């Protein structure tokens, strides 16, 4: 099972709404918001955590005050429940993936880059595949590979401790395959076409994932959820 949730980042969130939503996340996260130079970075960080909290509250029936985020030795967040999650954001979109197996997700806005950097950072087999693409699709293909590689690294949970060229993506088969030390990795890769101008990939460290659910949310829905939760707490006689 993989549940994907995504929300569009508004150009502006009313200050009172932002403060209310912020009150539903950890003090550590709240303190981090004031350090952001770009307010939209704070929006992205807030919305990412709220997506996870929404799932835990509504699906697992966990009270918001009982949700505590921790980090492993490599900095990947986790919770003390039988669930795995990962968050990514790029420009105007925030996405998260939730699963009963380790999972990673990455979204990137397609932007102009020098394709030659792929030769430096990618595995040689990936660079050969990239060079085989039509010139007008190479940039899009670059971000296709990049998001798959990022989602795999994030699923493992070791961040950049895993060299990005220590494994390679085989796009020449009916399904996307990852090889590490010439051995096929037991993973499942999804590449949902969510939004024009973006690439998104999701990786599960389980080879037989068959159930994928994708849900688009509005900021107002998150507001309503936490308003309802607050009202219930204040009227719990």
UniProtKB/Swiss-Prot annotation:
Pfam families: AASDHPPT_N, ACPS. It catalyses: apo-[peptidyl-carrier protein] + CoA = holo-[peptidyl-carrier protein] + adenosine 3',5'-bisphosphate + H(+). Its cofactor is Mg(2+). The keyword Cell inner membrane does not apply. One of its GO terms (cellular component) is cytosol. Mg(2+) binds at residues 106, 108, 150. Its EC number is 2.7.8.-. It is an enzyme of class 2 (transferase). Keywords: Antibiotic biosynthesis, Magnesium, Metal-binding, Transferase. GO terms for molecular function: holo-[acyl-carrier-protein] synthase activity; magnesium ion binding. GO terms for biological process: antibiotic biosynthetic process; fatty acid biosynthetic process; lysine biosynthetic process via aminoadipic acid. PANTHER family: L-AMINOADIPATE-SEMIALDEHYDE DEHYDROGENASE-PHOSPHOPANTETHEINYL TRANSFERASE, PHOSPHOPANTETHEINE TRANSFERASE. Activates the five peptidyl carrier protein (PCP) domains of gramicidin synthase GrsAB, by transferring the 4'-phosphopantetheinyl moiety of coenzyme A (CoA) to a serine residue. Required for gramicidin S production. Belongs to the P-Pant transferase superfamily. Gsp/Sfp/HetI/AcpT family. This is 4'-phosphopantetheinyl transferase gsp. It comes from Aneurinibacillus migulanus. The lineage of its organism: Bacteria, Bacillati, Bacillota, Bacilli, Bacillales. The gene is gsp.
């Amino acid at each position: 099972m993989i549940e994907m949730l995504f929300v569009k980042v508004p150009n502006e969130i009313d200050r009172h709404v932002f403060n209310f939503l912020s009150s539903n996340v950890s003090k550590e996260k709240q303190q981090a918001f004031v350090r952001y130079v770009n307010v939209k970075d704070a929006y992205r960080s807030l919305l990412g955590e709220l997506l996870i909290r929404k799932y835990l509250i509504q699906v697992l029936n966990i009270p918001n005050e009982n949700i505590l985020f921790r980090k492993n030795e490599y900095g990947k967040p986790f919770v003390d429940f039988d669930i795995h999650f990962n968050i990514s954001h790029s420009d105007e979109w925030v996405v998260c993936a939730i699963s009963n197996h380790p999972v990673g997700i990455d979204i990137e806005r397609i932007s102009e880059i020098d394709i030659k950097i792929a030769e430096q950072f990618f595995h040689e087999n990936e660079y050969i595949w990239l060079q085989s693409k039509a010139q007008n699709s190479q940039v899009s293909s670059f971000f296709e590979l990049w998001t798959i590689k990022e989602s795999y690294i994030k699923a493992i949970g070791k961040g950049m401790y895993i060299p990005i060229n220590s494994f390679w993506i085989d796009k020449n088969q009916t399904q996307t395959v990852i090889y590490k030390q010439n051995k096929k990795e037991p993973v499942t890769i999804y590449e949902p076409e969510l939004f024009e101008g973006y690439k998104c990939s999701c990786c599960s460290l389980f080879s037989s994932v068959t159930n994928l659910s994708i849900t688009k949310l509005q900021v107002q829905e998150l507001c309503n959820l936490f308003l309802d939760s607050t009202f219930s707490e204040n009227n719990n006689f």
